[in-house]
């Protein structure tokens, strides 16, 4: 083959170029003549244009950058196609014997091969539907994965089994939460018992079982609606049914016991028992019953009786059943409780169990004494037997056999005290008795006219069934009897017996209401104020002396104050007679007291409306009584007993 140096420079190149351009510009003929041999050899001689190499280099740089970012997969095909085109062009330019051109196909049959790189950079040949696609590039290794250090996306993982298990558990729980069950109970009373006060019980049950419990409305069927998980609903159902059954048992027990909420057993039906009725005012029925029946239960336990409380629409009468002495004791305790809480008895008539009197017995000194008052039994009811009359060995609040409280009262026989421990017996140390000369005076039957106080109702004797240490007279007890009162004075203006000598000889034995005060000397006493039934409206008067201790010449001191109760039923201590000794200090004015029934024995002008404490002499007007208590050494003009306070009597 001739070398390229022997070829003509201008003609061959120009002819080749012209032929190429002309072939590209003219329409192809039906049978184009093949180019001359010289033209085929001289065709690759000229340098290819630089545009395809520059475009391929720029494209290769861009594809390398995209490959570094992991996005060059789509550009591999273009890069390979461009590289192949460039290599083919370079081979055609360097080698003298170029590969045979592709058989002509279509209008580009006469196109020289040098124009192919310029026409098809990258994927441009694909835009021509008539052009044949380039051959597939050889496989290249994938670029390094720059995202290998990151965690895989959750979507790339398979379906998790743990999540499926959790969803199944949640689905089953949702099904159990929606469970609802109805729990019926027998009655609306059961509903109230299960719900509790202000819903406290049903709230606790909701919290305990972790359920929602809908309570039935008043007037609807007694059915609870429980919502929650299956096991929680079952637990709540068991609790509700158990509470309903428990309440049914309690109600059945109450119905067997007579329907009494305050009784644990039915009415006794033992031989020898009796039933009495104790009538009280309407306003004190709740006071006697007490909060939740506590007071009436305590009285039943102390007296061993069975007490039926009156209904709301019935008469205020308590039915007391038991042994005769226990029945009387229960009646006395009911009356004593009313007296302690209201400050006075309520008089409902001569035949009533409540009595009005003018006696102030310093109720707050007794504290929680079981009984304070005892009434002489009616003629139709036998008096209680004397078991331990006036003994001081019964503990406060402890159930015990009732004592005889009627010793020495009018119309009843005097009962001697068999107990040597009684501080108030006629033979014990420190004892005293009505109308007796000394501690060993005989005990006999009181005369019908003895101690006539002018009352239209039975005489009230003080119940002294409290321990000796708890009595109100404990500070005044001494080994030897002391003279206290002489003669029978008046109560509320009613005249008494004119002489005390007959009283001394009568020998009647009755316990005192007022203490025998010791002689002043070496003894310091502090007496609390007497009980007042209601707030004192006259307590702020200007003539009321201030409270304070008053000293006596012998060294004894007493607390002086005035106590003026405003209740009509509150009164002064009843004056009581005593068998004073012959040397008793009796003032001359005491003999004229019966003649001046309603006039003050001091000033003889004012009306008698005050009494002194503790002697209880109701002989003075209010001004004189206050003046007596305001002295440096206050003492009663009638008995020379130190006076601690003056009380106003509303008669």
From Swiss-Prot:
Pfam families: KH_1 (PF00013), zf-C3HC4_3 (PF13920). The modification Phosphothreonine is found at residue 510. GO terms for molecular function: mRNA 3'-UTR AU-rich region binding; RNA binding; zinc ion binding. One of its GO terms (biological process) is mRNA destabilization. Residues 131-144 have a biased composition (Pro residues). Ubiquitously expressed in all the cell lines and tissues tested. Its main location: cytoplasm. Phosphorylated. A zinc finger (RING-type) spans 600-640. GO terms for cellular component: nucleus; perinuclear region of cytoplasm. The modification Phosphoserine is found at residue 514. Residues 55-69, 85-99, 434-443, 499-509, 519-531 have a biased composition (Low complexity). Residues 179-240, 273-334 form the KH domain. Residues 1-159, 375-394, 401-443, 495-531 are annotated as: Disordered. Disulfide bonds: none annotated. It is found in: Cytoplasm; Nucleus. This is RNA-binding protein MEX3D. It comes from Homo sapiens (Human). The gene is MEX3D.
């Amino acid at each position: 083959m001739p070398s390229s140096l022997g070829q003509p420079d201008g003609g061959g190149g120009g002819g080749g170029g012209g032929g190429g351009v002309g072939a590209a510009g003219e329409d192809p003929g039906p049978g184009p003549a093949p180019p001359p041999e010289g033209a085929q050899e001289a065709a690759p001689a000229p340098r290819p244009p630089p545009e395809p190499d520059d475009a391929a280099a720029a494209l290769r740089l861009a594809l390398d950058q995209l490959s570094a970012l992991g996005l060059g997969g789509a550009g591999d095909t273009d890069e390979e196609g461009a590289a192949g085109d460039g290599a083919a062009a370079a081979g055609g330019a360097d080698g003298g014997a170029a590969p045979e051109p592709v058989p002509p196909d279509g209008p580009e049959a006469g196109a020289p091969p040098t124009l192919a790189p310029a026409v098809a950079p990258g994927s441009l040949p694909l835009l021509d539907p008539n052009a044949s696609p380039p051959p597939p590039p050889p496989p290249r290794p994938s670029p390094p994965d720059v995202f290998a250090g990151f965690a895989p996306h959750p979507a790339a993982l398979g379906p998790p089994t743990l999540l499926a298990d959790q969803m199944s558990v949640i689905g089953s729980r949702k099904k159990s939460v929606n469970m609802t069950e109805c729990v019926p109970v027998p009655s609306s009373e059961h509903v109230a018992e299960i719900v509790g006060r202000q819903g406290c019980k049903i709230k606790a049950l909701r919290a305990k079982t972790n359920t929602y419990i809908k309570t039935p409305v008043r007037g609807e069927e007694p059915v609870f609606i429980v919502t929650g998980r299956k096991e929680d609903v079952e637990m709540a159902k068991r609790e509700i049914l158990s509470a309903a059954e428990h309440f049914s048992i309690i109600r059945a027990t109450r119905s067997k016991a007579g329907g009494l909420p305050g009784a644990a057993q039915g009415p006794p039906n033992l031989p020898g028992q009796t039933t009495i009725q104790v009538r009280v005012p309407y306003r004190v029925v709740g006071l006697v019953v007490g909060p939740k029946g506590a007071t009436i239960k305590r009285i039943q336990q102390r007296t061993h009786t069975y007490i039926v409380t009156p209904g709301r629409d019935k008469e205020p009468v308590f039915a007391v059943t038991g042994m005769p002495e226990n029945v009387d004791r229960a009646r006395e305790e009911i009356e004593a409780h009313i007296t302690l809480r209201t400050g006075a008895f309520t008089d409902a008539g001569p035949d009533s169990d409540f009595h009005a009197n003018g006696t102030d017995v310093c109720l707050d000194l007794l504290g929680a004494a079981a009984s304070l008052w005892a009434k002489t039994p009616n003629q139709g009811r036998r008096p209680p037997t004397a078991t331990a009359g006036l003994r001081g060995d019964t503990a406060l609040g402890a159930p015990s056999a009732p004592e005889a409280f009627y010793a020495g009262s009018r119309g009843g026989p005097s009962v001697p005290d068999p107990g040597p421990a009684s501080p108030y017996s006629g033979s014990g140390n420190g004892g005293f008795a009505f109308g007796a000369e000394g501690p060993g005076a005989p005990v006999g039957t009181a005369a019908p006219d003895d101690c006539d106080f002018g009352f239209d109702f039975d005489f009230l004797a003080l119940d002294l069934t409290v321990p000796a240490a708890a009595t109100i007279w404990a500070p005044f007890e001494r080994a030897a009897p002391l003279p206290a009162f002489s003669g029978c004075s008046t109560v509320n203006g009613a005249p008494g017996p004119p002489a005390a000598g007959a009283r001394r000889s009568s020998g009647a034995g009755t316990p005192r209401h007022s203490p025998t005060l010791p002689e002043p000397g070496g003894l310091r006493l502090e007496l609390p104020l007497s009980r007042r039934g209601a707030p004192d409206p006259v307590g702020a008067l200007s003539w009321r002396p201030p409270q304070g201790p008053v000293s006596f010449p012998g060294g004894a001191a007493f607390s002086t104050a005035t106590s003026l109760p405003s209740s009509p039923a509150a009164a002064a201590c009843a004056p009581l007679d005593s068998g004073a000794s012959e040397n008793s200090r009796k003032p001359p004015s005491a003999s004229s007291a019966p003649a001046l029934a309603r006039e003050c024995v001091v000033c003889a002008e004012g009306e008698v409306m005050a009494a002194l404490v503790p002697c209880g002499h109701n002989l003075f007007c209010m001004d004189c009584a206050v003046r007596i208590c305001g002295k440096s050494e206050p003492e009663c003009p009638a008995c020379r007993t130190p006076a601690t306070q003056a009380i106003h009597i509303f008669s």
